[in-house]
Amino acid sequence: MKKILCGLIVVGMISGCSDPILQNESEKPEPEKAFALVDVMSGNAVLEDWHENNVITRVIWQKLKLSEACGEKYPALLDAFEKYNEESLTEAKAQMYELTPLAKEMEGEEYNPVYCGAEAKLYLQRADNHIVSFFEGVETYTGGIHPDYVVNGRNYSPETGAEVKLTEVLTDTKDLPSILEKKITEKYPGVTFFELEDTFSKYKPEEFTWTADYQGITFWFSPYEIAAYAVGTLSAKIWFDEYPELFNKAYVEAPSDYVMTLPVGHEIEFDLEGDGVKDTIYTEKRLDQYGSYNMLSVTVNGKTGTDEINYAYDFDVYLVHMDDKNYIYSDSTSDNDYHMFCTWDINGDTPKITQELYGTEMDYHFVEEGYETGTVYKQAFNHPESFVLETRFDILGTRGATAAYQVSKTDGTPEMKDGVYTFNYGHEVTTSIPLEAELLPDMEKTELPVGTSLTPYQTDGKSYVDLKTKEEQIVRLAIDESDWPRKVNGIPEDECFENLMYAG
């Protein structure tokens, strides 16, 4: 069950629009501009075509949005995102028009009814007042041995909403072909390439695919672009500290702690310890032994850790840099939209899971965007000191509750800021016996008569639950959720309340 603010479909958020920053009318950001993060939201929209009770074509793409505060601060960026959404919808409809006839001609399999489709997925690399940068992977399947796959870089200026040009980030591009040729051949010594430097010299700056993070810019090359399809997507990173004279200083500025979304199935380069040694991180989905679910595998500098217990269908994966240490957060989606939020420690020899938060995911909101339509926008956080997680609880029924978190400086796990969860969805409850309670804030003893309607409000998740009465008073009940059935004041909860509803 999903909480509703008002409207349907999945997505992501960030933090930093509460404090004013100096506005600059110049197209190029100036180095002295105060640094601030930008609250970006992104997520999935879907079109489907059915034939004989089966989906035969599906197109998935992602929509972009700003938080309300950032939308007011960066109206041009908000307009750019809305334009992107409109263009993406138009493209999705065109793909459906092209793919559906192909799908109808194919002989499908009984247990694999989706014959043609396309999916575009965005991974936020950086979002601040200088640049908002996404890596985008687009996969299209029209039959045959393998799908087509291309990668894009989408880079926006928050102030103007315009595309950030490569020539705005680099002060000079004349040596770019030779730099890229050197980096690519050194990184992939066993690969046979097309004539790289000659190929790159024919590229105009705007023809390169690139993204920006807090340590440099990465150039991406789709399959077939500079090598055979089987080689896959290739990349080369030019580091800020490696070619300092090459970069506009405004884009070099970085916070000491940050988060970026990892593109699953792609290797990224990062200097994890700030020691000048370039590290590699690779995350991928691996099928379980039955081929039904996926397992997440994390490889850092050739050492691999795999979660072989918590199977899922999909994962959102984040690199967290905090106090010169590094962690990976994974938010997995499994059956019945059940989530698992895991912390991976990657500071040692082999990546390993150090914490599992069951039923927990990044916070989300359903925003109405038209008559009976809308999008679920999900936080794609980039601020280790401030983010929100939602946890599914089985307390007086199944319900979701959110809490504010920060990354622990001790072990890198999500750390609650105030120890309180606030419920955001779930049904009202009605007492079936008189119940002793405490009336907040003075903790006065009171008794709730039979037939009292209450709305669960807050909990610590283990010892108490606060509920609101029809008169907006808050009462506290003692709970014990260590076993089934849950107990209220030491009494089985189904004896205390009528018709408690739990998810199956």
Protein language model features and the residues they cover:
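Acidic, glycine-anchored loop motifs typical of Ca2+
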Residues: 270-280, 321-328, 385, 425
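Short, hydrophobic/aromatic-rich segments at coil-to-beta transitions
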Residues: 129-135, 324-329, 384-388
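Hydrophobic beta-strand positions in blades of beta-propellers and related beta-sheet-rich domains
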Residues: 153, 291-300, 341-343, 402-404
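A short beta-strand motif characteristic of beta-propeller blades
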Residues: 304-310
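Compositionally biased intrinsically disordered regions enriched in Thr/Gly
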Residues: 18-273, 282, 286-287, 293, ...
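C-terminal motif of bacterial Sec signal peptides marking the signal peptidase cleavage site
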Residues: 13-16
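Positively charged n-region of N-terminal signal peptides that target proteins for export
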Residues: 1-8
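Acidic, small-residue rich beta-repeat scaffolds with periodic aromatic anchors
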Residues: 30, 34-44, 212-265, 346-504
